[in-house]
């Protein structure tokens, strides 16, 4: 039911093109996953999402547990039915969201207890409960419950989080029993490469169908992210997909793919869209700016998404300046299309064995002109 195959490899980098088969379809890699935290990619319908060529989306276990609750979703036929999305879904474990609550939570080896940010009620989340919730939600790929240390954190704090992550992974594996779901483990270790090495070794020892690199994009500078990815990705098994969590800029994506990462997710493209910002080439354009008031060109002349095909910059400027919901949707659609198109361009370059030449600039610094 789950199968991952590497179809092409880059000669001069670790980049690869793959195919992950799931019960709800194929994920072609490398691939960017849109984030649908509450079972929706904000402001976008499932049909519109498919038009961006999105293949798999991420939903958030923590938030869906709080509202509407996994029982409601299970009764509706599972998350695919609930949100009318018939393609692959990945659910994260909720660990990052819980730990981001800071003083609202208490952590020990048993699990995490915290006050609900919605109504103040007391909630306990353990590895067993996180997996049970995800089994009820019915996603194709589910993530182990982990402890994501903040940045910065001392080595002692990060080492403790790693040990707890590995302990919890054992309990996640023991609890997970759904054959039509793939459980992925998560490598932690902060910016300490020796801890990353040990975590990669421990997680790989469980022989899971996929492994994620977690604990990045939590406030550390981009050069630290690159160092972690370059060090950790080669340590992971070749035969399983590698998922870099929380990454959504073209530079980070290019570095990740060059080092053998297969897919990634981020809220950035839709968050920027909701704030009136478009991703165009390697730049971010604020459509509120007056320079777009009488600019009648397509948003991105190289893009064929719904937004760029049908609307000009002046109209988008008008929508954004007047806080029209359509403007936020159109920019979000374009931004998602932009990153998904970039993913596909990297795949084609790997297949043609020109990835190291075509995408080398993106791995070094931002540039203003490109050919994809």
UniProtKB/Swiss-Prot annotation:
Gene3D superfamilies: Queuine tRNA-ribosyltransferase-like. Substrate binds at residues 92-96, 146, 188, 215. It holds the Pfam family TGT. Pathway: tRNA modification; tRNA-queuosine biosynthesis. Its EC number is 2.4.2.29. The active site is at residues 92, 265. One of its GO terms (cellular component) is cytosol. It catalyses: 7-aminomethyl-7-carbaguanine + guanosine(34) in tRNA = 7-aminomethyl-7-carbaguanosine(34) in tRNA + guanine. One of its GO terms (biological process) is queuosine biosynthetic process. Zn(2+) binds at residues 303, 305, 308, 334. Its cofactor is Zn(2+). GO terms for molecular function: metal ion binding; tRNA-guanosine(34) queuine transglycosylase activity. Keywords: Glycosyltransferase, Metal-binding, Queuosine biosynthesis, Transferase, tRNA processing, Zinc. It is an enzyme of class 2 (transferase). Binds 1 zinc ion per subunit. Catalyzes the base-exchange of a guanine (G) residue with the queuine precursor 7-aminomethyl-7-deazaguanine (PreQ1) at position 34 (anticodon wobble position) in tRNAs with GU(N) anticodons (tRNA-Asp, -Asn, -His and -Tyr). Catalysis occurs through a double-displacement mechanism. The nucleophile active site attacks the C1' of nucleotide 34 to detach the guanine base from the RNA, forming a covalent enzyme-RNA intermediate. The proton acceptor active site deprotonates the incoming PreQ1, allowing a nucleophilic attack on the C1' of the ribose to form the product. Homodimer. Within each dimer, one monomer is responsible for RNA recognition and catalysis, while the other monomer binds to the replacement base PreQ1. This is Queuine tRNA-ribosyltransferase. It comes from Prochlorococcus marinus (strain SARG / CCMP1375 / SS120).
């Amino acid at each position: 039911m789950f199968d991952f195959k590497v179809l092409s490899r880059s000669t001069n980098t670790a980049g690869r093109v793959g195919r992950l088969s799931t019960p709800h379809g194929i994920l072609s890699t490398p691939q960017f996953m849109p984030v649908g935290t509450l079972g929706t990619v904000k402001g976008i319908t499932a049909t519109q999402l498919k038009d961006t060529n999105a293949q798999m989306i991420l939903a958030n276990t923590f938030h869906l547990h709080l509202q509407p609750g996994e029982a409601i979703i299970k009764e509706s036929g599972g998350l695919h039915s609930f949100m009318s999305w018939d393609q692959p879904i990945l659910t994260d474990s909720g660990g990052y969201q819980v730990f981001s609550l800071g003083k609202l939570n208490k952590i020990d080896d048993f699990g995490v207890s915290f006050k609900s940010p919605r109504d103040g009620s007391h909630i306990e989340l353990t590895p067993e409960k996180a997996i049970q919730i995800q089994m009820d939600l019915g996603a194709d790929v589910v993530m182990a419950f982990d402890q994501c240390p903040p940045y910065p954190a001392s080595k002692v704090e990060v080492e403790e989080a790693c040990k707890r992550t590995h302990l919890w992974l054992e309990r996640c594996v023991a609890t997970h029993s759904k054959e039509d779901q793939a459980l992925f483990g998560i490598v932690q270790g902060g910016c300490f490469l020796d801890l990353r090495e040990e975590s990669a070794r421990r997680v790989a020892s469980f022989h899971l169908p996929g492994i994620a690199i977690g604990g990045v994009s939590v406030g550390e500078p981009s050069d630290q992210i690159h160092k972690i990815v370059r060090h950790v990705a080669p340590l992971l098994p070749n035969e399983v997909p590698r998922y870099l969590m929380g990454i959504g800029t073209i530079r980070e994506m290019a570095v990740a793919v060059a080092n053998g990462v297969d897919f990634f997710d981020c809220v950035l493209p839709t968050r920027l869209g909701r704030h009136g910002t478009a991703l165009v080439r390697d730049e971010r354009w604020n459509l509120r700016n007056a320079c777009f008031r009488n600019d009648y060109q397509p948003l991105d002349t190289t893009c064929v998404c719904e937004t760029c095909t049908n609307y000009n910059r002046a109209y988008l400027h008008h929508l954004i300046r007047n806080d029209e919901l359509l403007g936020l949707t159109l920019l979000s659609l374009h931004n998602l299309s932009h990153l998904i198109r970039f993913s596909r361009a990297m795949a084609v370059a790997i297949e043609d064995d020109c990835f190291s030449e075509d995408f080398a600039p993106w791995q070094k610094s931002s540039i203003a002109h490109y050919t994809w």
